Amino acid sequence: MTDHPIKYRLIKQEKHTGARLGEIITPHGTFPTPMFMPVGTQATVKTQSPEELKEMGSGIILSNTYHLWLRPGDELIAKAGGLHKFMNWDQAILTDSGGFQVYSLADSRNITEEGVTFKNHLNGAKMFLSPEKAISIQNNLGSDIMMSFDECPQFYQPYDYVKKSIERTSRWAERGLNAHRRPHDQGLFGIVQGAGFEDLRRQSARDLVSMDFPGYSIGGLAVGETHDEMNAVLDFTVPMLPNDKPRYLMGVGAPDSLIDAVIRGVDMFDCVLPTRIARNGTCMTSQGRLVVKNAKFAEDFTPLDPNCDCYTCKNYTRAYIRHLLKADETFGIRLTSYHNLYFLVNLMKDVRQAIMDDNLLEFRQDFMERYGYGMNNRNF
């Protein structure tokens, strides 16, 4: 067995579910799990400073390989001393492989055994990304946790296509492992794919587990499938993954999905959802979603969430934040973004306490009722 730079320590398993309380040890510090990771696409979490992220309890953030490769370039970031120094963040960083962005943003994709040729979304230039190149970029970035290059097939793709895709993704994972230049200080995760097909998810997981990655990601979810379909995939995928390694569900940030994935044994999550909806004035609160731009809040001098102790809620009113957003003032977006990130990071803190107290199912029921999920199952 390899001595990996990323280690998982299980502290407690909840009595009634598969939920795990633990911590992940990285070269840039240790963070508790389950954990929600804010997304810093362009080496910044939109409108937030590193100090604010630490203040809210983010022990790790995510950055995007594809975007940083295109701009400003991974070699420039390496010259700066790596991503941590470049963005002045001294805690853990996870980078994705660039695969999802190639499939979702780029034009004219052509997938072969070698990799993917595509036109980049900034200037239309033809580019090529292979498993080896994705690893090389991430080695230059110097993230603590890296992702294997994978194909992310759509959830409802035909079985035969998905089968070929996961087999290629497994071969790509092995190529990425062989290309990894910094296994002593960067942990590379394998990504389980397989759309909604149980046998293909199991095959993908078996292939990757045999390669002894320091952690495993579950990809290809939160791409249009229903909440129940996501839970079903987790039900048959998570048990295939080792108990002594971290489990990361990619691209998931809706509160109900976070809680239900924790119940099934997932440790890490990321999503642009909290900052994206914040820019439109949509706020997550303990009583459900609140669209602070709405006219009814024009003279509402209460906090976004009376039960929240974040900087935004302790200092500013709905009326003021609404005014800022209506006037296109950046400070308004800073305040709503901070609040939403704080909400999800601290939801995970509350979930960790519920695991410690062995009452996660009761916590889930109470949260769902207060948040309004009975009326609308995808009420972000």
UniProtKB/Swiss-Prot annotation:
It holds the Pfam family TGT. SUPFAM superfamilies: tRNA-guanine transglycosylase (SSF51713). One of its GO terms (biological process) is tRNA wobble guanine modification. Its cofactor is Zn(2+). Binds 1 zinc ion per subunit. The keyword Metal-binding applies. Its EC number is 2.4.2.29. Residues 251-257, 275-279 are annotated as: RNA binding. Gene3D superfamilies: Queuine tRNA-ribosyltransferase-like (3.20.20.105). Pathway: tRNA modification; tRNA-queuosine biosynthesis. The lineage of its organism: Bacteria, Bacillati, Bacillota, Bacilli, Lactobacillales. Catalyzes the base-exchange of a guanine (G) residue with the queuine precursor 7-aminomethyl-7-deazaguanine (PreQ1) at position 34 (anticodon wobble position) in tRNAs with GU(N) anticodons (tRNA-Asp, -Asn, -His and -Tyr). Catalysis occurs through a double-displacement mechanism. The nucleophile active site attacks the C1' of nucleotide 34 to detach the guanine base from the RNA, forming a covalent enzyme-RNA intermediate. The proton acceptor active site deprotonates the incoming PreQ1, allowing a nucleophilic attack on the C1' of the ribose to form the product. Coiled coil: none annotated. It catalyses: 7-aminomethyl-7-carbaguanine + guanosine(34) in tRNA = 7-aminomethyl-7-carbaguanosine(34) in tRNA + guanine. Belongs to the queuine tRNA-ribosyltransferase family. The gene is tgt. The keyword tRNA processing applies. One of its GO terms (molecular function) is metal ion binding. The active site is at D96 (proton acceptor), D270 (nucleophile). This is Queuine tRNA-ribosyltransferase.
